[in-house]
């Protein structure tokens, strides 16, 4: 599998794994021991507020039986920049709700999301 295809598959493991609460797909998407999500949520007043959380903790929330995932519609990869054999960046439109950027790393031959930065649209 070419790097671009493997990166795309990893991003969609995250996107679809989140929507279906699929722990296996989520853990395949992230470098779980080091990955973080950082971004701007809109607070109750509609103002952007900076937020950060480790993915190890976030995956636990997402697979909880009580958790209800947001519905995003279709996700779209807007760009992929592979800048070395072990590093890449991806810009992803999360169904028009969020604009995500991913820092990707290649670990043991597999592309993983190391960090995600997002802005609530």
Model-predicted segments: where are they?
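Ligand-binding grooves and catalytic loops that recognize ribose/phosphate and carbohydrate rings
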Residues: 26, 34, 55, 117-121
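Functionally constrained cores in energy, signaling, and assembly domains
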Residues: 10, 18, 23, 29, ...
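Short, low-complexity N-terminal intrinsically disordered segments enriched in polar/charged residues
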Residues: 1-24, 28-32, 44, 48-50
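Short beta-strand edge/turn micro-motifs at domain boundaries
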Residues: 89, 99-121
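Surface-exposed, charged secondary-structure patches
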Residues: 6, 35-98
